[in-house]
Amino acid sequence: MTYLINKKNQKIAYKASKGKGPGIIFIHGLNSDMQGLKAKYIHQYAKKNNLSFICFDCRGHGKSFGNFEDFTMSDWKEDIINIIDKLTKGPQILIGSSMGGWLMLLAAQARPRRIAGLIGLAAVTDFGNNLYNNISVKNKKILKKTGIIKYKSFGFSYYLRTKFFKDANKNNFLVKKFNFKKPMILIQGMKDDVVDIDTPKKISNKINGKNIQIIYLKS
């Protein structure tokens, strides 16, 4: 395993292969990691087409430093920006899965000149309030008292702190327009029971650019 060491001396695990540009960076989803099938298939595509490729684990995920509940959207945004700044050269295509789609948009806002294009795979943004609203009244009281709760969703469970919800709202993408003229593709499954089918349209409506495609899959 290869690691990038950040300014706090924390390890960010990543995999990389060399190739021509524009490079590809894959960003995983919430409570996921770079070991998923999407990352593997995209890596295979990059190798076949001689494109540089990087996938990584955000802090608190996979092989990277720390526990999941100790980090926020701002931390993970910092991770992808570190990957772009320290491990890549030239234009990059960001591919974000689920929450990774939110992070790719935040990274594009922070480093617009480094982005060649964006591809969202069931990309979802601004979900802090939705997560909070799904918490039971009992657990909201526990969260208020202790600052942390065990969150269960679609067969998975993980811990979330009060700071996660507050920070997520500070990073909401849909609050203002984003001037982005590079190609963007948003791919969404019509039977997705996690990401709302209208999410790609909501994202598209906040982009000041015409080079946007929304692709719906029947699955």
Locate each region found by the language model.
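Catalytic histidine neighborhood in serine/cysteine hydrolases
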Residues: I207-S219
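Short glycine-enriched nucleophile-adjacent loop
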Residues: G101-P112, L118
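Short beta-strand/loop motif that positions the catalytic acidic residue
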Residues: F180, L186-Q188, D192
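Short alpha-helix in the alpha/beta-hydrolase fold that links the catalytic acid
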Residues: A39, K182, D196-N205
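Hydrolase active-site cap/lid region
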Residues: R113-L160
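N-terminal cap/lid segment of alpha/beta-hydrolase-fold proteins
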Residues: M1-K18
